[in-house]
Regions:
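Extracytoplasmic/secreted proteins, especially bacterial periplasmic and envelope-associated proteins
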Residues: 11, 18, 80, 84, ...
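A mature extracytoplasmic/lumenal domain signature
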Residues: 13-15, 21-23, 50, 97-99, ...
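Polyanionic/metal-chelating signatures
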Residues: 86-197
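Amphipathic coiled-coil/heptad-repeat helices and related helical stalk/stem segments
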Residues: 77-78, 193
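Solvent-exposed alpha-helices and their adjacent loops that cap or buttress functional pockets
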Residues: 3, 49, 102-103
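Histidine-rich, glycine-flanked metal-binding segment
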Residues: 2-42
Length: 197
């Protein structure tokens, strides 16, 4: 973008509300003003692939398919790396499971705020994603003997897992359709792994 000399950045409720030359940004009466003459103002940096602040390892290595595990459960909110990242201008991180699994765990998108609990760092109303690793990483992760050990095995693991997830969803769809007709039905057994997929 363009450099704005003699500009104003208006922040309301912790978010940038307006940016522009001083003459074009209306500053509300009573607003706190910070003279940043000679300084640079940049938006916060986003780290789209982070393993920051994971405590106790970021891979669930005993199985190649683990979408039921959640990174938020192992976030160390007191890790100094969070403070250092924030001091360096990083405001948001996407903390991911490691790459040892064909289908790994659920990510956590965190808004960095020093002194807050892990749950307080989580963005509200954000759908979690699941980390996938293809090819070499999952087949090289051989801390324990487990399948897959070839690229063919990695690809099959994906196909099989998605087929099982589709079958699981179909059972729940059938259950919901039956209930919507006013018929009592026995709910399928809940499976957190397939639910995550």
């Amino acid at each position: 973008g363009n450099i704005i000399s003699g500009g104003t950045v208006l922040i309301e409720n912790g978010k940038i509300a307006a940016v522009g030359p001083d003459s074009q940004v209306a500053v509300p009466a009573g607003a706190r003003e910070i003279d940043a003459t000679g300084m640079w103002v940049t938006p916060g940096l986003l780290d789209a692939h982070s393993h920051m602040s994971i405590e106790g390892g970021g891979n669930e290595g005993a199985d190649s398919v683990t979408p039921e595990v959640r990174i938020i459960d192992v976030i160390n909110h007191r890790d100094e790396s969070l403070f250092r990242a924030l001091a360096g201008g990083v405001t948001t991180i996407n903390v991911l499971h490691g790459s040892a699994n064909t289908i790994g765990g659920q990510n956590a998108i965190l808004k960095l705020r020093w002194g807050k609990s892990a749950d307080e760092l989580l963005f509200d109303n954000v759908t979690r994603g699941v980390k996938f690793a293809l090819g070499e990483n999952p087949k090289r992760a051989r801390a324990v003997e487990r399948y897959p050990s070839t690229r063919m095995g990695v690809e099959f693991t994906l196909r099989k897992s998605f087929a099982e997830a589709r079958e699981y969803q179909a059972k729940w769809d059938e259950y919901e359709a039956t209930r919507s007709r006013g018929v009592d039905a026995l709910a399928p057994r809940r499976d957190l792994r397939l639910e995550a997929l």
